[in-house]
Each structure stands twice: as structure tokens, then as C-alpha cells.
Regions:
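Bateman/CBS regulatory modules and CBS-like beta-alpha motifs in cytosolic regions of diverse proteins
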Residues: 1-28, 34, 40-42, 46-47, ...
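Short hydrophobic beta-strand motif reused across regulatory alpha/beta modules
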Residues: 49-51, 106, 118-122
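Structured interaction and signal-relay segments at domain junctions
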Residues: 51-64
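Conserved small/polar residues in nucleotide/adenosyl-binding loops
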Residues: 124-128
Length: 128
């Protein structure tokens, strides 16, 4: 079975760029109710995932942080504890399932590492 059958395309998925500010990332994650979000560079390549935990540990370095200051802190300066590993669009189901067992979502990239969407666990664990 083709894994693209389960794909939420990039156009339907929230993501952030690695040059976004902390405030932009926080507001995007809050708006979409995401605990983790794909991060891309401006060329559209998947560079990793930023999580609520990454943000919390990163903000610990700043004293008296407020939303105004968060507009000047860039997300690429935050250490990421564990990036979600992407799968290629032509991967097989076995590879997808092994990744999905340890990740909230599985990023999918094309053969040039361009982000094309995500596959979520709910899509293929649902009985319907």
C-alpha cells in the first residue's frame, strides 16, 4: 500500500520556519492546538520538529521573558531534544509504522528533502 494514501498534504498542515521568532511559534502552536510542529527552512526542506518541551527548556535561559521580548528570540537558537524522523514519499508501510510508533506524526519528504506533509497515527490506527 502506498503511504501517500494517508498523507495530510503540506497545504493542510501547520508548520513553522526555522527563522521564526519564539512568539510566532508559540502563537502558531496555540492556534492549531499542537504539542509539536514541523519546522522547515525557507527552501521548503524539513529540518526538524519543535515541541512544547523544547520551547519550555529553551525559555528557561531567559529571565523575565514576555511576549514583546519573544519577538526577538529566534527559534533556530533553541536546542531540540528529539527530532521526528521523516520518511521518504516512496517508503513502505513497514518503515512508516515503525516511525509512527514513537512519534506523534511522521513527516514525509520527497527525494529532495522537501516537506510534502505528515501522516498521523490516528489515520492508520482508526478502525473506520
Amino acid at each position: 500500500m502506498n503511504i501517500l494514501f494517508f498523507l495530510h498534504p503540506k497545504q493542510e498542515v501547520a508548520y513553522v520556519y526555522d527563522d521564526c521568532t519564539l512568539r510566532q511559534v508559540l502563537e502558531t502552536m496555540e492556534h492549531h492546538k499542537y504539542a509539536s510542529i514541523p519546522m522547515l527552512n525557507r527552501q521548503g526542506e524539513y529540518v526538524g520538529t519543535i515541541t512544547e518541551g523544547d520551547l519550555l527548556w529553551g525559555m528557561k535561559k531567559y529571565t523575565n521573558l514576555n511576549l514583546k521580548e519573544a519577538e526577538h528570540i529566534f527559534i533556530h537558537d533553541f536546542e531540540r531534544k528529539a527530532d521526528y524522523v521523516a520518511v521518504a514519499a516512496d517508503s513502505d508501510m513497514k518503515d512508516l509504522i515503525s516511525r509512527a510508533m514513537s512519534q506523534n506524526f511522521v513527516p514525509v519528504v520527497d527525494d529532495q528533502n522537501k516537506f510534502i506533509g505528515i501522516i498521523t497515527c490516528l489515520l492508520y490506527t482508526s478502525p473506520s
